[in-house]
């Protein structure tokens, strides 16, 4: 894949914000927030991503005043920040929620319009064996760093599944998420580092050593001065 990001056409995609004008049964963002199975960790993770994305991709009329309030706030709420999807094995970034199209609850996958260059595509095409995907031709997606199987790219689909064509289907089990801007740790420069008990003890120890050295030098200086004065008196 060329460049830092690879982008594919979302022809027939189901995103409610897509400019192509096509919609499908599951395109409504409200469907992304449906309650999923509580006993499945993958379903819970998918639900979390879907609900976070739904909170920032609602109707434009309702989003305008909320967007104004977010712009005025110094720190955006965590649920309003974009998600970065990482390889679960080597933690390389694979994509983000800004290219989100939809989630597939039955297959535990998310559909993205584009991914990063860390996702490689095996151009060997295979027929999908998934339920209700008869006639779909797929290309396998791998992580360029660790070769982990990430999912599939839909290259050819029957008419009723056209919304999946040229979309990247990433398996929830192969990826992890990171909320952009959620890190709290800051690097403190050496000149601004706060004193603690250990550093105070070390400083006091160094000062004591310097004091001992100065006293020794002062004693040597007195000895030299005494010898010089004694020599001058004899002469």
Curated annotation (Swiss-Prot):
Residues covered by the Mis18 domain: 82-180
InterPro entries assigned: Mis18 (IPR034752), Yippee/Mis18/Cereblon (IPR004910)
Organism lineage string: Eukaryota, Metazoa, Chordata, Craniata, Vertebrata
Name of the protein this chain belongs to: Protein Mis18-alpha
Pfam families reported in the protein's UniProt record: Yippee-Mis18 (PF03226)
MF terms in GO: identical protein binding; metal ion binding; protein-macromolecule adaptor activity
Record function comment: Required for recruitment of CENPA to centromeres and normal chromosome segregation during mitosis.
Binding site for Zn(2+): 87, 90, 143, 146
Modified residues (Phosphoserine): 37, 40-41, 235
Primary localization class, coarse: nucleus
Any one Gene Ontology BP term: cell division
Keyword hit for Mitochondrion: no
Similarity comment text for this entry: Belongs to the mis18 family.
Classification via PANTHER family: NEUROGENIC PROTEIN MASTERMIND, PROTEIN MIS18-ALPHA
Subunit structure: Homodimer, and heterodimer with OIP5/MIS18B. Identified in a complex containing MIS18A, OIP5/MIS18B, MIS18BP1, RBBP7 and RBBP4.
């Amino acid at each position: 894949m060329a460049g830092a990001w690879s982008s594919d056409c979302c022809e027939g995609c189901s995103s409610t914000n897509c400019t192509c004008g096509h919609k499908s049964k599951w395109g409504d963002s409200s469907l992304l927030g449906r309650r999923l199975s509580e006993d499945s960790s993958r379903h819970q993770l998918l639900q979390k991503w879907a609900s976070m994305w739904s909170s920032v991709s609602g109707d434009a009329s309702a989003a305008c005043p909320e967007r104004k309030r977010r712009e005025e706030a110094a720190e955006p709420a965590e649920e309003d920040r974009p998600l970065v999807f990482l390889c679960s094995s080597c933690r390389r970034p694979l994509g983000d929620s800004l290219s989100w199209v939809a989630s597939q609850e039955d297959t535990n996958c998310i559909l993205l319009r584009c991914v990063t260059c860390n996702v490689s595509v095996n151009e060997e095409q295979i027929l999908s064996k998934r339920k209700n995907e008869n006639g779909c031709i797929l290309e396998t997606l791998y992580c360029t760093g660790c070769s982990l199987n990430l999912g599939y790219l839909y290259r050819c689909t029957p008419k009723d599944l056209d919304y999946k064509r040229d979309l990247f289907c990433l398996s929830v089990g192969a990826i992890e998420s990171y909320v952009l801007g959620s890190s709290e740790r800051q690097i403190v420069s050496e000149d601004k580092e706060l004193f603690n008990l250990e550093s105070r003890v070390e400083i006091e120890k160094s000062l004591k050593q310097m004091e001992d050295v100065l006293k020794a030098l002062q004693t040597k200086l007195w000895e030299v001065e005494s010898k010089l004065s004694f020599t001058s008196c004899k002469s």
